[in-house]
A protein has these predicted regions:
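A Lys-centered signature of the CheY-like receiver
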Residues: 121
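Receiver (REC) domain active-site loop signature in two-component systems and cognate sites
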Residues: 70-73
Length: 158
């Protein structure tokens, strides 16, 4: 990824340590140099997002991308997805469901709840990392300057 993409932190919520290691290894071997944070279950991720975990949260969806497994202990991916999309600080967080579940009803449920993409494991990692690069780029491009009014006349870009 280019230096512009290094501002995006990739969060992986995956309870299977082997799957998580494989995902991280494949991302690194494809040249992804972004910070990657691994969460072992949905509750650990949710605690991080809410600032209650052991790590420090930035409390802002900008600059993050979430790879989310569905079947996890304590708090499953569907519940995490639903909570994130209902949260005013995190609802814009890009979420890619990355799971072994290929049931069309599950896929539709994830899309209805607001996931940005649904990928079934195992997957072709070159295509996956290319998609991440495109999504990361679009995250940076989508950010627009805020217009602040000046004494009731027009606005000023900030």
């Amino acid at each position: 990824m280019t230096s512009a993409h290094t501002n995006v932190t990739i969060m992986i919520a995956e309870d299977d340590e082997g799957h998580a290691e494989l995902i991280m290894e494949q991302l690194r071997s494809a040249g992804v140099s972004n910070e990657i944070i691994h969460f072992r279950d949905g509750q650990e991720l949710w605690d991080y997002l809410m600032g209650a975990g052991q790590r420090t949260s930035r409390h802002d969806a900008h600059g993050f991308l979430l790879l989310l497994d569905i079947v996890m202990p304590r708090l499953d991916g569907l519940e995490v997805l639903q909570r994130i999309k209902a949260d005013k600080q995190w609802h814009n967080l890009p979420i890619i469901m990355l799971t072994t579940t290929d049931d069309p009803r599950e896929i539709e449920k994830c899309r209805t709840l607001g996931c940005n993409c649904y990928i079934t494991k195992p997957m072709e990692y070159e295509r996956f990392t290319e998609m991440l690069k495109r999504l990361g780029l679009s995250l940076l491009v989508v950010q627009t300057p805020k217009i602040q009014p000046q004494n009731g006349q027009g606005g000023k870009l900030t």
